[in-house]
Design a protein with these regions (language model features):
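Conserved ATP-driven motor cores of ASCE-family P-loop NTPases powering translocation/secretion/packaging/pilus
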Residues: 307, 311-314, 348-349, 463, ...
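N-terminal pre-Walker A segment at the start of P-loop NTPase domains
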Residues: 387-406
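Extended, folded cores of ATP/NTP-driven motor/assembly subunits in large transport
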Residues: 2-384, 479-482, 559-561, 588
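Charge-patterned, long linear interaction tracts outside catalytic cores
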Residues: 188-225, 516-521, 525-560, 768-791
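Acidic, low-complexity intrinsically disordered tails
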Residues: 785, 789-834
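Composition- and surface-driven signal marking solvent-exposed, interaction-prone regions
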Residues: 123, 209, 297-306, 316-322, ...
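P-loop NTPase motor domains
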Residues: 397-403, 411-413, 418, 423-424, ...
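Flexible glycine-/small-residue-rich
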Residues: 47-50, 114, 195-199, 283, ...
Length: 834
């Protein structure tokens, strides 16, 4: 008998040891599985736009917070069944609100298993359609040289009793929580609130409803909890409700008890049933703070803990912070960093309670430093050209809900022109340079007019070495080898009339209207037409003063003049003009033309009878024209004059292509930065007509107020594609009408650098507006070839420029500038127009 009991004892001991070993192995396996699961979490940064909310809409705050409750409820479907669920635990969803140790914005994150990453992203977008849900690398709140503090929130009472929630609180509970996070220093201090959730199943609901039923029968809350949660037999007994004749007596007792319940008991029952009616989660709530010293870290943590006091209900439940130290703190920081769910920290909260302590910010939240989405995003059109489709350029990527698509403009659509607007430093030059690079590499004809010089210099460095001979670099600052540019160089009567009209328009734009009147226009028109009469030996602007002072020179030109009106101007009108009035006229003209004639740099460019390069040849043979018209080096008026002459000559060359078929007209892409400086009233004609002649414009500038009303109307009325980077308030108001309803004025004001809102012409149809991230060449391995750029400059100046001494001698001979002329009368500008 003794041997039998001894055997039984040994068997029990062995089974206990085996059980302990199996338990330890299971725990080790579970710990390993938890770690693997933690390392396989996808982290998303969630940002929402802060929209203007009216008074009526402010009343809907609770409805907005309820959206978060619905989102959390949807995660109840994430369940792991079978042995895998036992070993590795249920999948967790993690909600975090954090301020990094460098930076001051309050960021909102959501994390979940990598295998569910797409589901999480899609679900968040389903409830928050305007949100940006961006997968990101992990962040850091910890000061590497500082001290850390941490707390775990626990429930003050059993989970049956609910907390105060957003439904009963008067204001958004996130105000207090986020305010605590908004008081951190920009560097060296960080903090986070972490909510780790696992679905709790359904058994807790049954127990909670059982407690409510027992209280309805007159039992106190404590007695009801003790019986409902007092073990399996007690729970079955409560659920069975008795048998036989006892049912009727119990129902009568229940009815009697209901009538004797105190108001507090009735409210408690209602609260328990309300909590149990919603999905529940096992939750860890961790508060972490980091600062340069322990005192400051503890202070930050205390402010976070105090922010959760608002959820305490005097008769029901509340949070009880448990601050940890030493080894327990190290374990807490480990669990926080790896987002590990801990049974020891778990408490049961329903979706209403969780969404009260954590929800994405709503627009009425007044806390500063919230990491709002600066501008909304919109999906790209379905008919965006694919990478292999057609012949075009890529301007960036459309990033929408984690999906990236290249944004391309096809050749045919580019013929309807592109308008780009954005403040300085927002990425305009980057966009232009990337498009220029692609055009040059594809062998396209390209023109660049740059009033700053940086884009021109960059474009030079992007030219492949095999295209060096295609480049014409027009740099007025190179005074040793000036390149000629003569506006009075024209073929045929139509071109002469156009050139004169443009030159008049240029002067009217460069000078105030009160000093450029009808007499100035009349005299200048006849003078220029006379100088242009001999196409083999055209005159220049520099010779205009001479034509009014040298009668012999006029007589030498008149035989070439075929226009009877122009001849009559000299033979009749000027012949009858007194010397005094001629002198007065000369003074008036010199006051306008003289500023260019007297400037050596300008004189050596516009005084050459033959332009140093043939623009028609550049366009037809797909060459590259780069004009560096740096205002800082040559002055704004000089830069504008040369730029407008270039644009006018390009327009003349384009129109002259009417002598060849459309199929034979090579596309020429003209990039004009600060285009308002280089356009006259004829811009409307260029935009509407140049498409036929394959002159395709890409126009950029900083703000719409720079544009005269007629040019603004011409641009917005004729341009096929619009691209707006960040703009100011006035421009935002104007452009919002172009991009509604997808984007508002606020969106356009808050775009990050290199982000743009575009409305493209796609296969002849205008797309709906969408957002684009501009490609950054330096991130795509594009390296400027500075050595080649220098070689290009040298090749171009030797090919198209002429020696300074030769040019000066020629101009002096033609213009007779060294010859004394009658002194201009001392008169006020515009006096001759009276």
């Amino acid at each position: 008998m003794t041997a039998f009991f001894l055997t039984i004892f040994i068997v029990i001991i062995v089974l206990v040891i085996i059980g302990l070993i199996l338990f330890m192995l299971l725990e080790m396996k579970r710990e390993k599985a938890r770690l693997i699961k933690s390392l396989n979490m996808a982290l998303f940064l969630v940002r929402l736009p802060k929209e203007d909310i009216s008074g009526e809409e402010r009343k809907q705050d609770k409805e907005r917070i309820a959206v978060m409750e619905q989102l959390i409820s949807s995660f109840a479907t994430m369940h792991e069944g079978g042995w895998k669920g036992v070993v590795s635990g249920q999948p967790a969803v993690v909600l975090e609100m954090a301020v990094h140790h460098i930076g001051e914005e309050i960021h909102f994150y959501i994390a979940g298993p990598v295998r569910s990453a797409e589901l999480i992203q899609r679900t968040v977008h389903g409830f928050y359609s305007a949100a940006s849900v961006e997968r990101v690398q992990d962040y850091n709140i910890f000061n590497p040289h500082g001290t850390h503090a941490g707390s775990v929130l626990t429930l003050a009472k059993r989970y049956f009793l609910p907390l105060r929630s957003y439904v009963t609180l008067e204001s958004d509970p996130l105000n207090n929580i986020s305010n605590a996070l908004s008081k951190l220093e920009r560097e060296g201090e960080g903090a986070a609130i972490q909510v780790v959730m696992q679905h709790a199943g359904n058994s807790w609901n049954k127990k909670a409803f059982a407690v409510a039923r027992l209280m309805q029968r007159g039992k106190s809350y404590e007695a009801a909890v003790s019986e409902a949660a007092g073990g399996f037999l007690g729970f079955l007994k409560e659920l069975s409700g008795g048998v036989g004749g006892e049912d009727k007596k119990k129902k009568e007792a229940d009815e009697k008890a209901k009538t004797s319940l105190t108001p507090l008991a009735q409210e408690t029952i209602k609260g328990i049933e309300g909590k149990a009616s919603k999905a529940g989660f096992s939750v860890n709530v961790r508060l972490i703070a980091s600062a340069p010293d322990a005192l400051r870290a503890e202070r930050i943590l205390e402010q976070l803990e105090n922010a959760f006091a608002q959820f305490s209900h005097p008769a029901w439940n509340g949070f009880k912070p448990r601050r940890v130290k030493g080894r327990a703190l190290r374990n807490l920081l480990y669990n926080f960093s790896f987002r590990v769910f801990s049974e020891d920290e778990a408490m049961l909260l329903n979706t209403e309670e969780i969404s009260s302590l954590y929800h994405f910010p709503i627009s009425t939240l007044q806390t500063p430093r919230i990491g709002w989405l600066k501008a909304k995003t919109a999906p790209p059109p379905e008919n965006l050209p694919e990478a292999e489709e057609g012949d075009g350029v890529t301007i960036g990527d459309s990033l929408f809900r984690g999906q990236a698509r290249a944004v391309r403009m096809l050749r045919e659509d580019r013929r309807r022109h592109l308008y780009v607007v954005g403040q300085t430093g927002t990425g305009k030059s980057t966009l232009l340079s990337e498009m220029i690079r692609q055009d040059i590499e594809k062998g396209e004809g390209v023109g660049i007019i740059d009033p700053h010089g940086d884009l021109a210099e960059l474009a030079l460095s992007l030219v492949p070495r095999e295209r060096i001979k295609d480049v014409v670099y027009f740099n007025p600052g190179d005074m040793e080898r000036p390149v000629g540019l003569n506006m009075l160089e024209a073929k045929g009567e139509d071109q002469r009339d156009f050139a004169v009209q443009e030159m008049i328009a240029i002067f009217m734009k460069l000078f105030p209207p009160e000093v450029v009147g009808p007499m100035f226009e009349h005299n200048m028109r006849n003078a220029m037409l006379t100088l242009m009469a001999d196409p083999e030996n055209p005159g220049t602007i520099v010779e205009i003063p001479r034509i009014f002072t040298d009668e012999a020179y006029v007589r030498s030109l008149l035989p070439k003049v075929q226009d009877p009106v122009v001849r009559a101007f000299w033979e009749k009108e000027m012949a009858k003009t007194s010397e005094f009035h001629k002198s007065e006229m000369l003074g008036y003209l010199v006051s306008k033309v003289g500023r260019f004639v007297e400037n050596e740099m300008m004189r050596n460019i516009i005084g050459q009878p033959r332009s140093g390069f043939n623009i028609r040849d550049i366009m037809d043979n797909r060459k590259i024209l780069i004009a560096n018209l740096s205002k800082g080096k040559m002055g704004e008026v000089n830069s504008s004059l040369l730029g407008m002459i270039l644009v006018s000559k390009l327009q003349m060359a384009a129109m002259a292509r009417g002598d060849i078929t459309q199929e034979g007209r090579a596309d020429f892409y003209l990039y004009i930065d600060e285009f308002q400086n280089f356009t006259t009233d004829s811009i409307a004609t260029i935009l509407s007509e140049a498409r036929k002649y394959r002159l395709n414009l890409i126009m950029a500038h900083q703000f719409i107020a720079q544009l005269p009303e007629n040019i603004k109307n011409a641009a917005f009325g004729n341009v096929g594609s619009l691209c707006a980077l960040r703009v100011g308030a006035d421009d935002g108001e104007y452009l919002a009408k172009q991009f509604e309803p997808a984007f508002s004025q606020q969106d356009l004001l808050n775009l990050d650098n290199f982000n743009a809102v575009v409305k493209l012409m796609i296969r002849g149809q205008t797309s709906r507006p969408f957002n684009t991230l501009v490609h950054k060449p330096w991130e795509r391995g594009v390296k400027p070839d500075l050595q080649a750029a220098q070689a290009l400059k040298e090749f171009s100046r030797l090919t198209y420029g002429r020696a300074r001494e030769v040019v000066q001698k020629e101009i002096l001979e033609r213009s007779q500038l060294a010859r004394p002329v009658a002194a201009p009368s001392a008169m006020t500008p515009g006096e001759s127009n009276k």
